A protein has these predicted regions:
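Nonpolar helix-loop interface/hinge motif
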Residues: 1-54, 163-232, 243, 267
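Membrane-interfacial helix-loop-helix connectors in multipass membrane proteins
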Residues: 145-158, 225-237
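Specific transmembrane helices
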Residues: 46-54, 79-104, 125-142
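Alpha-helical membrane-spanning segments of integral membrane proteins, especially the hydrophobic core
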Residues: 76-84, 109-138, 155-163
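Membrane-helix interface motif
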Residues: 48-65, 134-147, 220-226
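Juxtamembrane transition segments at transmembrane-helix termini in multipass membrane proteins
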Residues: 2-3, 56, 60-77, 86-90, ...
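Interfacial transmembrane-helix boundary/kink motif in multi-pass membrane proteins
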Residues: 27, 31-35, 104-130, 191-194, ...
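Residue-level signature of the transmembrane alpha-helical core
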Residues: 35-39, 81, 85, 123, ...
Length: 277
């Protein structure tokens, strides 16, 4: 399987985003099979983590918008990153199953809880890119926290600017995640880069458009300051669970994007349907 090398077709942006939003609703039963056991296992873990960090998060959110808030913003980013690492095995497993369902109609079993080689490779790729983006974008803040030397605002701005082109590159390469999920080792990073040429902004803004609605329930974090520890922990846990389910929209976008640039051959789909379980 290889992409069109002459002139890559432009991704139909809004149609793809709309289809990505429709997928979880259209296949809600399958989504339930993919997620319910993982969510059940992760809920107590998330609740424990949220209980531990709730006082710190509440304090940070209370300082947002103040001068003190500028110095603690990196702490909120770090806490978010740590939670992402904890969630990564579950999220990667769910994403791989969802990719395979959308593209090759592979039906997950009702007690889906799988971590195989594809899931590990998927999670590793996400982890590496996240560490690089997070490290470069917040390098001045992390270095200041480690050394006690406060960096000027222009240095923080430069770090953010440097992270932007890297973010665009990561977006262009993102369909490789789908190839990993499908176990298609014949698709290389070079193939993905060539196939997505002239689609950089679509690849970058597509996932953003698919997760932007998650900011609506996230607004409740600004009210954590008035909650007790248990309530704050419950809210943080609920937001994490919503983000996992809502993130499936972004996974759907990647699947549809991959199908656009790398059309699936009929015999591949048929093999997936009749393959023994």
């Amino acid at each position: 399987m290889s992409p069109q090398t002459s002139k890559p077709a432009k991704l139909p942006f809004w149609r793809t985003v709309g289809s990505a939003y429709a997928m979880p609703f259209k296949h809600a039963d399958t989504l339930g099979h993919v997620t319910w056991l993982w969510l059940g296992l992760m809920t107590p873990v998330l609740l424990l983590m949220s209980w531990i960090v709730a006082p710190l998060v509440t304090d940070i959110m209370g300082k947002i918008g103040t001068l003190a808030g500028r110095d603690v913003h990196w702490q909120l980013q770090m806490l978010s990153f740590v939670k992402q690492i904890v969630l990564l095995p579950a999220v990667a497993s769910i994403a791989v199953a969802w990719h395979r369902f959308i593209l090759i109609n592979e039906q997950p079993n009702e007690r889906y809880l799988e971590i195989d080689r594809n899931v590990m490779l998927y999670a590793s790729y996400v982890l590496v890119t996240s560490v690089v983006l997070n490290g470069i974008g917040h390098f001045p803040a992390y270095l200041a926290a480690a050394t006690g030397i406060k960096w000027p605002d222009w240095a923080v701005g430069i770090a953010s600017v440097l992270a932007l082109p890297l973010l665009l590159i990561v977006a262009r390469y993102s369909p490789i995640l789908v190839a990993i999920a499908l176990g298609q080792s014949d698709i290389s990073l070079g193939d993905v880069w060539a196939a997505t040429r002239r689609n950089t902004w679509r690849m970058a803004l597509g996932p953003l458009a698919c997760i932007i609605l998650l900011g609506i329930p996230g607004a409740i974090m600004f009210h954590l300051n008035g909650m007790n520890r248990l309530s704050a922990a419950a809210v943080l846990t609920l937001l994490d669970l919503i983000s996992i389910i809502g993130g499936v929209v972004g996974v759907s976008f990647l699947s549809l994007t991959y199908r656009h640039f790398f059309p699936m051959k009929p015999h591949i789909r048929m093999q997936a349907v009749v393959a023994p379980v």
